Design a protein with these regions (language model features):
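Bacterial N-terminal signal peptides
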Residues: 1-6
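N-terminal signal peptide c-region/cleavage motif recognized by signal peptidases
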Residues: 9-11
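Short, glycine-/small- and polar/acidic-enriched structural segments
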Residues: 16-157, 164, 171-177, 191-195, ...
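Solvent-exposed, polar/charged alpha-helical surfaces in well-ordered, non-transmembrane soluble domains
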Residues: 39-40, 62, 66, 89, ...
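Pocket-lining segment of extracytoplasmic ligand-binding domains
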Residues: 77, 157-248
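Secondary-structure end/capping motifs
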Residues: 215-293
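Conserved C-terminal helix/tail region of periplasmic/extracytoplasmic solute-binding proteins
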Residues: 286-309
């Protein structure tokens, strides 16, 4: 049983069923899974996807550990938990620079620059998540040290972030640029800075396959990645159609999604290959942020064996 999530399944049947977990329902790096699903691209490749949306990477990791997922879609920090024994391996670098993420503040906040966040409470999706890492990376890059800000787990749903802003449970939040752009329209919050203003090369999105799937059906992984890359090709060349679909999926106005599309479309990789610079950044971060005790051998955490030729 998978708890703390939302499930979407295609009504039809296909040759191979894959349960795909997403760490966030509306993350720009992950929503193309839903786009490809709705377009029938995965089905065309002989796959019947069951998409499970979680409210953070930790809950998704629990489902993977329990054997409930075949594929997980999250961020680069998920690889740290592979080093700690999570039974999966990263198989695709979805996105590089985290252009889809930013730091937002409540609409009535007096904060006008990132420098004013020193010592402040910053909302994150869950402990050990990519958003926690980015909050702590802000402190490190500003010279405040890894404890220069206080991460507060509030989830990554719009409702929970909105409530945290209105009740001033946090001074800021690491979340989707689109979310903050929409909040600005409603005077709930506003975008302070994009994460890319202080964080460069990093694997901001990855697919991982369960060890069970790797051992029992490696061809399904190859097929999934081929369908994914076909989906990204469509997203790149069909802005209007993509914006309309993602607007409905994210429940955001098309004008907001259109602006967000322009900011984020360049982050997707065209071949799923892992960037050495991004891996080096992750390796450093895993230790600095105490996800692991010693630097892991990154080559054991991912494989490019399933990439389409």
């Amino acid at each position: 049983m998978i708890l703390g999530c939302a499930l979407v399944s295609h009504p039809g049947s296909a040759a191979t069923t894959l349960t795909v977990g997403k760490a966030s329902a509306t993350s720009d790096a992950l929503v193309p899974v839903n786009v490809g699903y709705e377009l029938g691209i995965f089905e065309k490749h002989g796959l019947d996807l069951k998409i499970v949306d979680f409210t953070g990477g930790s809950k998704m990791d629990q489902a993977m550990a329990a054997g409930s997922l075949d594929i997980s879609a999250g961020d680069g920090t998920e690889m740290a938990f592979i080093a700690k024994g999570l039974p999966m391996r990263a198989v695709c670098m979805i996105a590089g620079p985290p252009s889809f993420l930013g730091i937002g503040v409540p609409g009535d906040s007096p904060i006008t620059s990132a420098e004013q966040l020193k010592g402040k409470k910053i909302g994150i999706s869950s402990p050990g998540s990519f958003t926690e890492w980015l909050a702590r990376e802000l402190a490190r890059n500003k010279g405040w040290g890894p404890d220069g800000v206080t991460p507060v787990a509030i989830g990554n749903g719009v409702v929970s972030v909105t409530a945290a802003f209105r009740q001033h449970l946090v001074d800021a939040d690491v979340g989707g640029v689109a979310t903050f752009l929409n909040m600005e329209e409603q005077k709930i919050g506003r975008l302070l800075v994009p994460v890319s203003s202080y964080e460069g090369s990093i694997a901001s999105g990855t697919f991982s396959a369960s060890n069970h799937l790797i051992q029992t059906n490696p061809d399904a992984i190859r097929t999934f990645l081929a369908a994914w890359l076909e989906t990204i090709g469509y997203v790149r060349t069909h802005k209007a159609e993509t914006v309309k679909m993602e607007s409905r999926i994210d429940q955001l106005p098309e004008e907001v999604v259109s602006k967000d599309y322009d900011v984020t479309i360049g982050m997707f990789t065209s071949d799923c290959k892992f960037d050495p610079a991004a891996l080096a950044t992750l390796k450093r971060g895993f230790v600095e942020l105490k996800f692991v005790d010693t630097p892991p051998d990154m080559s054991k955490l991912y494989t490019e064996a399933f990439l389409p030729h």
